[in-house]
Amino acid sequence: MRRFFTILLLALMSVCAFAQRNGLVLSQNSPNPFDGTTCVYLAVEQAGEASLVVADVYGYFQTQWSQPLEAGVHKFRITLRAKGNYVLGAHHNGASGSVVMFCNIGGDANRIEYLGRVDEWTDEVYQNLTADDYEEEFVGYAKNKSNDQSAMTNNSSSFRVALSLSPFTLNQFDAGYTFQIGDRIATTPEELQLIYQSLGSTEMYVRLATKRHKTYKPDGTLDNTTDGKADENANVHTFDQVMTTCRIAAALDIPINPEVMCAYIYMDMDGTQAPRFYRDDYPELYATNATWRTILKDGDAQWSELSLEDICTVLEIYGEFVADSILATGCTVNDWNLGNEANFGFAGIGIGVPNAFDQTLAKAGPMKRYMASLFSLWWLKKHVWCYNAKQYAAVKRGILKAYAKAGKDTSNVRFSTHIATVTSTPRASASFFRYMADNGYAVDVAGISYYPSAPAMSFNKKKLLTKTVTRINKKCGVNVFIGEFSYPSQNMVGPFAGWNQQLGNYTKSQQGQADIYRDVIAWGKDNGLIGIRYWAPDYEGEWYPMSMFEFENKVGTAKQILTNHKEIVQ
């Protein structure tokens, strides 16, 4: 039901955004809220008389401006004398637009100042004008080891092809699955990953929850429930399974990219879950670390009761423990990913989750997830991202401690976080990574999920990708990695039934699936994309149309996208 609500809401928002287009575009003011003075941009398609008017929420006029404008994008500075909520209206050649502004502290007068024409009118401006477009380039990454502009124009030689066992693969082999690719048959995870490597894979992937062990029913079958409710992720991302996958990577001598969710079972754009650190799951930490034991009250503390400082302390200890354990398997880790589709929360601090220090979060409903990216990034910064930045930094510190303790070089170790694009705009995506860097967590690579067939805030899914990648490159100075990508070869069903939107000429067929994958890679290598992970290539379940295999009686037979994979990624 939650997934259906998400799909419906995104579709409605796309329709509403499309209906508002005309020959005038007014950006949201920035900053917003503001102290006395703020800036706004007005784009007009044709020359003509223009006017701006500011009124309070009761309709009382505050200030106005009018004069002829030529076609293009024009910048204005607005000053308001009193604290309050205001409406800014713009009119030009019969078209109009308005935005709501929030003034926290009054300025010295009420006035609108015209600062000049800053750009020409383009289709891109028409579709997505924001004040951030015309700010100075971000310099928060000036000393970042990944800030190499040449690397963001051509990544062909170092492009990451993350074709990997999925988090579900171990369970599928345990259930008796086999996989056939051409004349090769894989009966073990190691055999399947070796085939992936022969087809161009450069790294493996694993996703980690804080649940330590798989749980079973009395009859010996997996108990796929969490807190008494059915949960498809209940026995997929456990610590034990992660260690097994890391040992496979070590044996095959291929780097692995761990994704540390800091959630008990799972997290994504639809929900942020707190970690759980049961005493029976982490006996070594309770036995050896007094700080851990004290903060978590010997295993009895609730995450929602902890201060932000204590949460970060625990996360740092956990990050060190995780890195110690993963590195002890002998595997090579060049890239660490923190969180999964983490637009709206991480490690138990996010929209709709109770905590001890910001009650606004617990009261925020699901609508906030889909409206904030469009209309109130300031709210995400104030109530979500400010806390998450500290959490990410804490986990990173812990991981780096493990490297130092082991005497391992970290010059090639990179950190990333990936966010969902279906619930975001290019502006919001870049703002996320910029804000994190400004507040202590500068990623080396910016991660995104990109599902072209899923409902999103943008009708044009191709532009959603290209604008998101290039905007992050431009505003943040880092490459982008697509942490999740897939496209269906036939109609999706069940909870993913809404993920059936065809993109352009890419049909829902084996050919269309292979073609879009090829074209995204080809474009990305020349445009700031450093790699791609085809999500869950070997998973059946209700995901099978997205998979790289056709399934029958627990036998997976490779689709065209996989049999031709080596040529596709070259």
Please provide the spans of the model-predicted regions:
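Bacterial N-terminal signal peptides
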Residues: 7-14
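Glycoside hydrolase catalytic-domain groove-lining segments
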Residues: 192, 259, 385-386, 404-415, ...
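Aromatic-rich peripheral "rim/lid" segments of glycoside hydrolase catalytic domains that contact
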Residues: 129-130, 134, 138, 183, ...
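Short, acidic/polar
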Residues: 178-198, 315-325, 425-437, 514-521
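Glycine-centered tight-turn motifs at strand-turn-strand junctions
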Residues: 26, 49, 58-84, 93-95
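Substrate-binding cleft and catalytic face of glycoside hydrolase catalytic domains
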Residues: 194-399, 403-406, 411-414, 420, ...
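Boundary/entry segment of secreted carbohydrate-active catalytic domains
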Residues: 121-202
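Surface-exposed, proline-anchored Ser/Thr-rich loop/turn motifs
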Residues: 20-43, 60, 101-120
